[in-house]
């Protein structure tokens, strides 16, 4: 990890009282935060709300945004239907690697576990956090009649300390897996978004800017 990102990570750990000394886990929380905070009000969620838990397979963070609110339970899905009579949904999936290179096997694994997630089958070997998120997603699709403008959108963020170069092999892996996800007929759109080291630094700094008046 370069010295600039190291400094940002140290500040994040201090500011959010991250209570693990494991730098890999710290970076997972950091990646989850910068992705979600740049798409959703950072003051309206806690780091634990978007973590898939310790040693969850293949996916480090998931944010389920329903009607512009972060949803953290099945009951909140039901409440959103009750009070809004609609479901506008966006799934944000996050996987982070502290390494300085984008690896095809890791990206493939991220997609594989994302596809497994959307089989909607909780498993006792998964973390409680991941099982809870699977149940939330299942509740969303059970109530598909409330989709208002479109089916849910899926965005997959892969965060790494390397440099993104549009590598042909990686691009092939990504494109093939996107097609497989699209063929599930669950999503309005599927998008893969790489965060390389420069993007990580830029997006972290954006989280520190004052919120502009709307």
PLM region spans:
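N-terminal extension/subdomain marker
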Residues: 1-214
């Amino acid at each position: 990890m370069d010295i600039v990102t190291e400094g940002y990570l140290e500040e994040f750990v201090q500011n959010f009282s991250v209570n693990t000394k494991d730098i890999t886990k710290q970076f997972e929380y950091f990646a989850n935060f910068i992705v979600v905070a740049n798409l959703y009000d950072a003051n309206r969620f806690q780091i634990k709300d978007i973590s898939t838990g310790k040693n969850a397979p293949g996916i480090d963070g998931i944010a389920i945004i329903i009607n512009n609110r972060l949803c953290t339970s099945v009951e909140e899905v039901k409440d959103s239907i009750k009070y809004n009579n609609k479901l506008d949904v966006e799934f944000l999936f996050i996987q982070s690697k502290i390494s300085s290179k984008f690896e095809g096997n890791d990206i493939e694994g991220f997609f594989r576990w994302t596809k497994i997630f959307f089989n909607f089958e909780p498993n006792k070997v998964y973390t409680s956090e991941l099982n809870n998120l699977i149940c939330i997603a299942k509740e969303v699709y059970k109530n598909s009649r409330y989709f208002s403008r479109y089916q849910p959108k899926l965005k997959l963020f892969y965060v790494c300390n390397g440099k993104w170069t549009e590598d042909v092999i990686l691009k092939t892996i990504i494109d093939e897996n996107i097609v497989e996800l699209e063929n599930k007929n669950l999503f309005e759109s599927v998008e893969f978004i790489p965060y390389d080291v420069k993007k990580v630094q830029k997006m972290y700094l954006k989280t520190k800017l004052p919120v502009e008046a709307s």
